[in-house]
């Protein structure tokens, strides 16, 4: 049964939990101590800002934010305008170019136009220290994103989850496959993309699954705001 819960409702419940309070407190103290934490504070929850719970059609799970300057802005795999696409995103574009007729690889890596169409771009850990991959793992973010996935599982039906790599696939264990669609492949990282991410055709498959439900497909060409 679907209800009209919003992300605000889900977040409000979690914000009262000790683990969540402790996580935010840790991140706040790290920032206050002068450490550079990505993404900036205002962007940490952007995935929920641009894709409301009732609008989600597709979920793409990432691991933790990019840890280089000016990259992370709260949407998994996406980078700010003007920043070159990192290697994993370059492979995502490569797959799109072979999977979606007419797809042209853009010169940017800004995926907000996906989010605005209903693609929840969710990292399972929402912050990271500059230059230190996975530095904020096991603080409590994973518990939070498990609750987010559980809310999607319970409140929605027919979502398409794209689970790339073992980390995302473990998260997928809580998704009811009778209610939702799960597409799995290796991670698009250069270390593993050639093992089956390239050639997975997840983007066209996701659109077919949406169209079978009478939903509009995703325009997978990432557009900058002035192009929209």
From Swiss-Prot:
Record keywords: Cytoplasm, DNA damage, DNA repair, Hydrolase
Biological process, per Gene Ontology: base-excision repair, AP site formation via deaminated base removal
GO molecular function: uracil DNA N-glycosylase activity
Catalytic activity: Hydrolyzes single-stranded DNA or mismatched double-stranded DNA and polynucleotides, releasing free uracil
Subcellular location: Cytoplasm
GO CC annotations on file: cytoplasm
InterPro entries xref list: UDG_fam1 (IPR002043), Ura-DNA_Glyclase_AS (IPR018085), Uracil-DNA_glycosylase-like (IPR005122), Uracil-DNA_glycosylase-like_sf (IPR036895)
Active site: 64
Domain of life according to the entry: Bacteria
Coarse class of the protein's main subcellular location: cytoplasm
Family: Belongs to the uracil-DNA glycosylase (UDG) superfamily. UNG family.
HAMAP family membership: UDG
Chain's role: Excises uracil residues from the DNA which can arise as a result of misincorporation of dUMP residues by DNA polymerase or due to deamination of cytosine.
Xref: PANTHER family: URACIL-DNA GLYCOSYLASE
Protein name in UniProt: Uracil-DNA glycosylase
